[in-house]
Amino acid sequence: MALVPMVVEQTNRGERSYDIYSRLLKERIIFLSDEVNDATASLVVAQLLFLESEDPDKDIQLYINSPGGSITAGMAIYDTMNYIKPDVSTICIGMAASMGAFLLTAGQKGKRFALPNAEIMIHQPLGGTRGQAEDIRIHTERILKMRETLNKIIAERTGQPLEKVQKDTDRDFFMEAEEARAYGIIDEVITTAKK
């Protein structure tokens, strides 16, 4: 388990220490810096809902450095981002791959960013199943439907034709930050923090 730094603040009641992520949450900053799975999705969703309850009119920043992960867990984050009232700004640091890239596109249009050396990768969903032939057929139909849903959302969020997204996601499709801007996944490559 990684060591999480602590920060100490002086208040009128004395000193107060926070882990760094809790301190950043006070500034409405959420980090997704791991695989997207049920546990990380629950944490991100809880933080989004908490920040909405604190101030429904103030933007939330979601920093993404993720290799991707579970579609259903990612869709829980995606749906919550769209469900809550505050705009969610997305910022790619490092890499946003697969579901990480999908969530990067899900930020409020005009508020989707990447740092200059960030890397973005989109592709079709991965899956694997074993068992009886009928079960394999059921899972195959499900993953094909998920691929169709994801591609439609990416096309809508980026402004790319659906046919292009289908072709580009057929295999791993890597982009540098500027290429992701041209594609429509992000709106701007930034070198300094946006306030």
Curated annotation (Swiss-Prot):
What stretches pass through the bilayer?
A: none
One matching Pfam family is CLP_protease
Q: Does the keyword Cytoplasm apply?
A: yes
Please list the residues that make up the active site: S98 (nucleophile), H123
Recorded superkingdom? Bacteria
Enzyme Commission designation: 3.4.21.92
Coiled-coil annotated residue ranges, if any: none
Recorded protein name is: ATP-dependent Clp protease proteolytic subunit
